Curated annotation (Swiss-Prot):
Function: Catalyzes a trans-dehydration via an enolate intermediate.
Family annotation (Gene3D superfamilies): Dehydroquinase, class II
Organism: Geobacter sulfurreducens (strain ATCC 51573 / DSM 12127 / PCA)
Protein's name in the database: 3-dehydroquinate dehydratase
InterPro entries the record matches: DHquinase_II, DHquinase_II_CS, DHquinase_II_sf
Amino acid sequence: MRILVVHGPNLNMLGTREPGIYGTLTLDRINESLVALADELGCTISPFQSNSEGALVDAIQAAAGTCDGILINPAAYTHTSVAIRDALAAVALPVVEVHLSNIHRREEFRSHSFVAAVAVGQITGFGADSYLLGLRALFTHIEKGIVTKG
């Protein structure tokens, strides 16, 4: 099983960017933790980060036929990108959306997610553990062969 892990804009700045909100772990450390969990579960991950909406859409589209699911933190694009939402729907893979902070407890504009409508589920507010919980949930969902539509 292969999972695409998509990290949206500004996540390359983790560790130094607003640590009171996003924590002190770097994106590299989060990816290392995801690789370790993937090894434990018996799957592989392909992490991808970009600050560019188009590059994120390209990576999502490339997952069709090569990946079994997508774990995504769309970051700020959560609240603005119909293009990312449509790309996720188009590839028709199971998607789990994750966020480091609880987007529903922050500014009002952050509480709406375009991605949620095409995701199997959303895990938010557990810091870096949101990624690990999301990977475990996505793996289990795929293993059980649950069919979902985005």
